[in-house]
Amino acid sequence: MFAALGSAVPVAAGAATGKPHRGTVLRAKPAQVSIGPRTVTTWTYDGRLPGPRIEATAGGLVRAKLVNGLPADTTVHWHGIRLDARMDGAPGYTQKAVPPGGTFDYVFTVPDPGTYFYHSHVGMQNDRGLYGTLIVADPHEPLGYDEEFTVVLDDWVDGVGGTPDEALRRLNASTAHDDTLRSTLLGGVVGELRHPYHLINGRAAETPEVFVSKPGRLVRFRVINAAADTAFRVALGGHRMAVTHTDGFPCAPVTVDTFLIGMGERYDFLVRLGDGAFPLVAEAEGKRARAFAIVSTSHRAPAPAATCGCAS
């Protein structure tokens, strides 16, 4: 299967160094972020969307200090990681919630390499921007590739259609269901809300993220669905993708035109890039909306439109 991608080369980005994680401070606090043409006030880690990228090596320790600058209790959950339950971030079950002004030290071993993420586990806080990536390198990485990019998908309402909590209250008070939110997959129902924006790495389609590479490079994409209510169908225009990992773990490689990623899931794929500018599109399954980014290997190529063949 990999013959179609060309010969493997030594991995450059994301390679394990064997060095321990130096520690991260996650400052949960209100901040202003740009969502398309709007500037909204939301909750973030360190004023960033997504929050800081944490990198570790399988078998090593992660050290992260949560500093709660929010007007509400909070925690951090490490999504997909096998760890000591005391570090899992489930308030009322594995730890006490961290109050406003409080701190908590998360210290745990990451046993498995792969693509993971972290997020608040209190109420609707994950929907307000409290999430970030956790990439665990394999010290014996079997794949050879030139570089890697991380793609974080999200659906967004905070500061545009009220807060996520307000949107949930409106939904619970209504007896109607939007029957247009349908799919032939996922049991037919693909969500409860229409979100004003769908994001890639915190950016809306009006001001898309641009991944810059070179023609012929073999690139690993790590795709994380951090959305609360949206499954996405992902495609890279003009390319087929070799899916190599699901939820952090290696799988039998499958070459596809598109793949469907549910909430909380992660997929890794390899692709050898062509020459030009290509749309990376994540169709919101059953919602007639999309997240959009650009993969560019040529400064001469025009920016693509936010469409590609992601038929649902």
PLM segments and residue spans:
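Non-catalytic, beta-strand-enriched accessory regions in extracellular/secretory proteins
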Residues: T42, D46-R53, D105, H195, ...
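Extracellular and analogous surface-interaction loops
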Residues: I54-A58, V210-L218, R272
